[in-house]
């Protein structure tokens, strides 16, 4: 294997034995020796580590790091640990152990580098469920703040404030894999409560939640916003028993920043046109040309395949 690693794919894991092998193979089978995959296991009690060690023997660019279980350590800290182990010049983030990735990660990287030619390296390219940035830049801006359940949104907000958040709309080329019942329960019901709790810890009020819901009641996720209003009392009681968080993330300023960024965003063709440039789609693989020239709402990955 080439010892010069250019790209680090950072992956956290906790008790994902039912999806981890298929998820990682979907990534490892589409990359070359310019890439490494860093998996930080957060003290799994299932067969995750056994599966990871077996895969590590099979794939020379997979590196597994085990942490002792700490119930107080949240995902932001685990993600930061994976980043600290990364050797690559560039980081690919938010690739998780319950995601199956279709073979277009390298095309996403090509898109990043084409944008980099006119924007420089000081930005985060935020695609559909996948993010990429220069390691030195991202490490100098956090990357993730401790204490936040929604660690990605916190980082996006801080980068958007300095004009370094570049959203890119494209066909989603990953799918969520089937989870266990307890994992589904956590994602659908418990995690939203923890998210609202931390929004309250950051200073958000019921009035602010109501305003955000009314301002976005016709958006695709209005049901989720309504659910957040309903669980507000439970989250409020939990928040009052915990230390407050800096008011830098969960507020209308963030929502307005992100809404503005996404309202001005589009496909790679739109992004290049806005900057007075023309994107050469021929640099992408044939199916990736479809993926990155269409919005996520226009076509599904199944139609592309």
Which role does the model predict for each range below?
Residues 34-43, 65-68:
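Short beta-strand/loop segment that forms part of the nucleotide-sugar
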Residues 88-100:
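Short beta-strand-to-loop acidic/aromatic patch adjacent to the donor-nucleotide binding site
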Residues 129, 168-206, 210:
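Active-site donor/metal-binding and catalytic loop motifs
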Residues 69-86:
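Glycine-rich, basic loop-to-helix element that forms the pyrophosphate-binding segment
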Residues 99-131:
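Conserved donor NDP-sugar-binding/catalytic core segment of glycosyltransferases
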Residues 15-29:
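Short, well-formed alpha-helical segments that are part of the catalytic scaffolds
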Residues 41-51, 71, 96-99:
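A conserved acidic beta->alpha catalytic loop
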Residues 149-155:
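Acidic donor-binding loop at a coil-to-helix junction in glycosyltransferase catalytic cores
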